[in-house]
A protein has these predicted regions:
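Short, highly charge-biased, low-complexity peptide segments
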Residues: 20, 29, 59, 245-251
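Phenylalanine-focused residue identity feature
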Residues: 12-13, 19, 101, 136, ...
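Solvent-exposed, conformationally flexible loop/turn segments
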Residues: 169, 208-211
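Membrane-insertion modules used to breach or fuse lipid bilayers
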Residues: 143-202, 240, 247-274
Length: 274
């Protein structure tokens, strides 16, 4: 009986490295094959005006901030996920020197209350978020069809924003912008401009005896999710450094984020003035 138990125990311990290796392989596969984002399909009625736009919009791509070795160590020590680029930047700028005489030393430094991460639950487009232009022609006296195309009559600034007041709004907007861009595959910005005189060659035919209307809309995405806040502390214990997060709270939030350099068109022909 004793020999049987010993054989079982030895077999178990021999198999442990195999289980550990299998888990590491799974973790590596997750890292190398992250979940693909859901790319939004752009309808035919929506056109890219990047080349035609007379107002050059600045690129709003938010660069992914790389944490330093110390910052990565601190982030890994936190029980709450940290994605806030402003907090990561502050940690990158911090320097904590270890000393061989630090045995028994302990200190806790309060770094403030921060929005720690944002989790997206929905990214949905509204292709007619804001009306920005109307091209019109009266062809009621005409005997044949008349062609019109899009010409931006005046400069239009399209703004997005959060749907509710929230602490550290600018930091939250940065995290939401990153997630919305990943989920949609679109170029997004909380503010975009369409310049006067912007044109597209696409032709729309107004039949004889009709009024023709070509409406232009600025599209946007409606981003919804949850932001997590917490009080952040840095604990120094001997030569070890770690992050402790206390009083963690979560809050639902939404935002409208315009799509840069895109216009959605709607054409209609009618007998009467609209």
């Amino acid at each position: 009986m004793y020999k049987k138990i010993m054989i079982v125990l030895i077999s178990f311990f021999l198999m442990l490295p195999m289980f550990t290796y299998a888990e590491k392989v799974k973790e590596k596969e997750k890292e190398e094959n992250p979940r693909k984002s859901k790319i939004i399909t752009i309808p035919n009625a929506v056109m890219n005006i990047t080349k035609e736009n007379t107002y050059p919009n600045p690129t709003q791509d938010v660069p992914k901030l790389q944490p330093s070795e110390l910052t990565q160590q601190l982030i890994n020590s936190s029980k709450v996920k940290i994605d806030n680029p402003d907090l990561i930047r502050m940690l990158n700028e911090s320097t904590v020197n270890s000393t061989p005489f630090a045995l028994g030393y302990k200190a806790i430094v309060y770094l403030g209350q921060w929005p720690l991460n944002y989790e997206s639950t929905e990214t949905a487009p509204n292709w007619e978020y804001q009306k920005i232009n109307t091209n019109f022609y009266d062809n009621r006296g005409g005997k044949s069809s008349y062609q019109i195309h899009y010409v931006q009559e005046s400069q239009k600034k399209v703004r997005g924003g959060l749907t509710a007041k929230i602490p550290n709004a600018e930091q939250v907007k940065k995290m939401m912008l990153v997630k919305a861009a990943q989920n949609s595959g679109l170029s997004l910005a909380f503010e975009t401009v369409v310049g006067t005189g912007t044109k597209k060659d696409q032709v729309y035919n107004i039949p004889a005896k009709r009024l023709g209307y070509l409406y232009g809309y600025a599209p946007a995405v409606n981003e919804k999710g949850k932001v997590t806040y917490g009080e952040v502390y840095m604990m120094l214990k001997g030569s070890k450094k770690s992050i402790i997060v206390k009083n963690v709270t979560s809050q639902g939030i939404g935002a409208w984020i315009p799509v840069q350099d895109h216009v959605s068109f709607e054409f209609s022909a009618s007998e009467k003035t609209k």
